[in-house]
Structure formats: structure tokens, C-alpha cells
From Swiss-Prot:
Its EC number is 7.1.1.-. It catalyses: a quinone + NADH + 5 H(+)(in) = a quinol + NAD(+) + 4 H(+)(out). Its main location: membrane. It comes from Rickettsia typhi (strain ATCC VR-144 / Wilmington). This is NADH-quinone oxidoreductase subunit M. It is found in: Cell membrane.
Length: 494
């Protein structure tokens, strides 16, 4: 391994690029030249960041469950804040996924965003930096700072570049997630008052000394903070509005990365911090997850807007993640992590596909489409593969995560597993219905007759995701083996 502080470089490279764009790119340049220059800097930054994360993945030792590439620097010692970062098997793929999806979003944004492109790309680079920081933070306060900083650029993206109701959606997104943040902050203050440290590797061994009643209150405050982010029912209503109003790239990052921060928080903070209380309250989370799967699937069936349907499907798919996590089985948690990764790729592909349709017809209403496959066979093929993965077809990424999550929960709660399995059937119904109504049949809208198939930049954005969907489905052990020991280590307390 290199002795370079590679995680710090990966976190701060996008931030340095932002500073360069804001401070040193000459504003007097003509708009077209300025946009090209900004796009080149953003593209170079995202490519280099992606290369760095791939290097980390290659050098990562899967036979070691402890944090690797660890860096630790004192920052504000009086309040326990250190720049303490590292990567284990649970975090590694989310770091890679963040850099990969950011690169794809920047490629697409260069060709589709017409106004304030400099500010738009700056927001994506900021989110990339903050997300990587959150996934690698080992200091709990540092995790909180990165976790909450992500709200600002996402709020701006929805509020400035979103649809007609973007202000309402952006405010709703911000208020819901900020509501969860307040609970998390209260939990942090209490933890520090008792343990006088935010170092995760230190406080995990001491939280059992906290009185049981206080542990239970602490558990609920942290749970709510992460449940809002996932989002779990009843904290879910901000997501459909945010997805419908967000631009395509905003929806990709929201579904592909931001939703995963909540479930990652369960794995990184809640379960290891409060293992006994987590087991006690697991049954409530399991049934909330089952309700989310069935309810969201039924609501998705009734949607007339493509993005709203995909948004509700995301809530259902994240339900499989939470039942897997709270099964407290190696199979279930491994399935949950795999499902998080798979959903990140599948949902990103779905939103990019919807984005290509919207660029041509400027509507997300399902009834306005029909017969698109006859004019866009490449898109239809990509859509079919993505759709089949979304419904959990064997040999696709979606099957592995859902199957392992259900198998894990089946070992501890047969009733919950059987009810949750119905969600797969419902998912197949609404996704096949969507594909049929959009892609098949006769062309009833004359504008569709003038559609052209995917442009090169659109193929460049979607094709890698399709390849990953197939690779994950055919070679799941290459992914599962990387975080196997980290999952085993997580379960030691259970």
C-alpha cells in the first residue's frame, strides 16, 4: 500500500476542484467557454476520484475485518473532534459507488443542464466529497458533520434545477432530514457527556455502561435520524416529491447514494453502539419494513408518473434492506448490503432511462408514452434488463440482495419473511406494467414517431450500470467475500 493519505486525498480532491472553479476560473470568459472549462475541471476531478477509489478497492485486504488506510489527525480536541477516517469491508463499495455515480452524473449533466452549469457541477462535487467523508468517518462527530453537510447541495439541486414544484419539494426534503438531524445531535451530545469521546472504535466498548433506560431513549433518537434518510414509513413522504421534482442527476444521487446513508448508519452506528437494545426493538423495525414493502408496492401500482412509481419502488426495496439488517443474521445483513449496492445501481439506471425519455417528450406521465421500443431499441433493451433486476430476476443483481435478505429474516421470523416475499410479486406487477405501457404497444403520441435512439453520452452513462447489474448477478461472491469478515465482526456482539 502507498503511504500517502489516500482517503484524505479522495475526500478533498473534489473540494479542491470546487475551490479552483469558484476562485480561479475567469468569470469574464464567454458563457460557452466558461461552461466548457468548468466541465473539464469537474470531469477531471471526478475521473481522478474514481481512479483513487478503484485503487483503494484493489489494495483493500478482504482477509482483514479492521479499518484499513486509517488516518487520524487531531482537529478540535476540546470537543472530541478528530479527522479520523478508515475503510472496512462494509464501507469500501459505497465509496466506490459514490465516485462512480458522481462521474456518471457529471457526464450526463454536461449535455443536459442549460442554466448555471458551473454551480450545478459544484454541488455534485461537494456531495461527492461529503458522501465519501461520511462513509469513511470513524469519528462519530465527523460522521455527523459530513452526514448533515450533504443536505445543503442536495437542497440547492432540487430547489434551483428541479421542476415546477421544486421549492416545495426542496423545503420538504430539508425539513424532514433536518428533523432527523436534531435527534442525532441530541444523541451525540448525550454520548459525549457520558463517554467523553466520539471515536467509534473506543465508545463501542463503553456504551453498555450507560443506564438501560437511557440506552433505549438513545436508540430511538438515532433510529429516527437514520430512518428519515432511508426513508422508512412513516418518514417517507418527502421522497416521492423530491424525486419527481429533482433533475435526473439529482434523482440518481438521491436514490443511489443518499438513501444508503441511513441504512449505512444502522450498520456503522446504531447496531454496534447499542446491540442489546437493537435486538429488543428489532421486531418493530421488521414489521415497519414489511409494511413499507407492501404499502409502497401497492401505492406504486397506482402511480401515473414514472418517477413517482420508481420513488415508491425505492421505499419498498429499502424495506428489504432494513429487514435484512435487523434479522441479525450473517445471511440477512450480507443480503442487505448487497441490496443497498444493487439498488444504488438499478435505481440510478432507471432514473437515467426516465431522464432520456423526459429529454425527448418533456413529460413523466406514463399515459403519454407507448410504443417507444420501436423507435429506441437500445433504450428498450437497457430498460428491460434494469426492470428485470428491479423485480429480482435470477442472474441479475436484484435477485441476490432480495433473496439473501429474505432468507436471513426467514431464519428468525417466518411470518415477516412470507409477507415481505409478496412484495416481489407486487414489484413484478408494477414494473412489468410500466414497461408494457411505456415501451410496448402502438405509438399513440405522434411526437414519439420522431424519437431517436440513445445518444453516445446517454449510452456512456447507462451501459456501465447495465454491465454492473449483470456482473453482480453472475458473480455475487466477488462482492460478498469482500465484506464477509466485516459482517462477521459486526455480529460478534449479537
Amino acid at each position: 500500500m502507498l503511504e500517502l493519505p489516500i482517503i484524505s486525498i479522495t475526500i478533498f480532491l473534489p473540494l479542491i476542484s470546487v475551490l479552483y472553479i469558484l476562485l480561479f476560473i475567469n468569470q469574464s470568459k464567454k458563457a460557452n467557454k466558461l461552461n466548457i472549462y468548468v466541465a473539464m475541471v469537474a470531469m477531471l476531478s471526478s475521473v481522478l476520484t474514481f481512479i483513487l477509489t478503484i485503487y483503494i478497492l484493489i489494495e483493500f485486504d478482504a482477509s482483514n475485518h479492521t479499518y484499513q488506510f486509517v488516518e487520524r489527525y487531531t482537529w478540535l480536541d476540546k470537543i472530541g473532534l478528530e479527522f479520523h477516517v478508515g475503510i472496512d469491508g462494509i464501507a469500501i463499495f459505497f465509496v466506490v459507488l459514490t465516485s462512480f455515480l458522481t462521474l456518471i452524473c457529471i457526464i450526463g449533466s454536461i449535455f443536459t443542464i442549460k442554466k448555471y452549469i458551473k454551480e450545478y457541477l459544484v454541488c455534485f462535487l461537494l456531495m461527492e466529497s461529503f458522501c465519501i467523508g461520511a462513509f469513511t468517518a470513524v469519528n462519530l462527530l465527523l460522521f455527523y458533520l459530513f452526514f448533515e453537510a450533504i443536505l445543503v447541495p442536495m437542497y440547492i439541486i432540487i430547489g434551483v434545477w428541479g421542476g415546477d414544484n421544486r421549492i416545495y419539494a426542496a423545503l420538504k426534503f430539508f425539513l424532514y432530514t433536518f428533523f432527523g438531524s436534531v435527534f442525532f445531535l441530541l444523541a451525540l451530545i448525550y454520548i459525549y457527556s457520558k463517554i467523553h469521546s466520539f471515536d467509534l472504535t473506543y465508545i463501542l466498548a463503553l456504551t453498555e455502561n450507560i443506564p438501560l433506560f437511557a440506552q433505549k431513549i438513545l436508540w430511538w433518537t438515532i433510529f429516527i435520524a437514520f430512518a428519515v434518510k432511508i426513508p422508512m414509513i412513516p418518514f417517507h413522504t418527502w421522497l416521492p416529491d423530491a424525486h419527481v421534482q429533482a433533475p435526473t442527476s439529482g434523482s440518481v444521487i438521491l436514490a443511489g447514494i443518499l438513501l444508503k446513508l441511513g441504512s449505512y448508519g444502522f450498520l456503522r452506528v446504531l447496531l454496534p453502539l447499542l446491540p442489546n437494545v437493537s435486538q429488543e426493538f428489532a421486531i418493530y423495525v421488521i414489521y415497519l419494513s414489511v409494511i413499507a414493502i407492501i404499502y409502497s408496492s401497492l401505492v406504486a401500482l397506482a402511480q401515473k408518473d414514472i418517477k413517482q412509481m420508481i420513488a415508491y419502488s425505492s421505499i419498498a426495496h429499502m424495506g428489504y434492506v432494513t429487514i435484512g439488517i435487523f434479522s441479525f443474521t450473517e445471511t440477512g445483513i450480507s443480503g442487505a448490503i448487497f441490496q443497498m449496492l444493487s439498488h444504488g445501481v438499478v435505481s440510478s439506471s432507471l432514473f437515467l432511462i426516465v431522464g432520456t425519455l423526459y429529454e425527448r417528450l418533456h413529460t413523466k406521465e406514463i399515459a403519454k408514452y407507448g410504443g417507444v421500443a420501436s423507435k429506441m431499441p437500445v433504450l428498450a433493451t437497457f430498460f428491460m434488463i434494469t426492470m428485470l433486476s428491479s423485480i429480482g430476476l435470477p442472474s441479475t443483481s436484484g435477485f441476490i440482495g432480495e433473496f439473501l435478505s429474505l432468507l436471513g429474516i426467514y431464519k428468525v421470523n417466518v411470518v415477516a419473511a412470507c409477507i415481505a416475499a409478496l412484495g416481489i410479486i407486487l414489484g413484478a406487477v408494477y414494473m412489468l406494467k410500466l414497461y408494457k405501457e411505456v415501451m410496448l404497444g402502438e405509438i399513440t403520441n405522434t411526437e414519439i414517431k420522431h424519437f431517436k435512439d440513445l445518444y453516445r453520452y446517454e449510452i456512456l452513462s447507462i451501459a456501465p450500470l447495465i454491465l454492473i447489474i449483470i456482473y453482480f448477478g453472475l458473480m455475487p461472491n466477488s462482492i460478498l467475500n469482500v465484506f464477509h469478515l466485516s459482517v462477521e465482526n459486526l455480529l460478534i456482539k449479537f
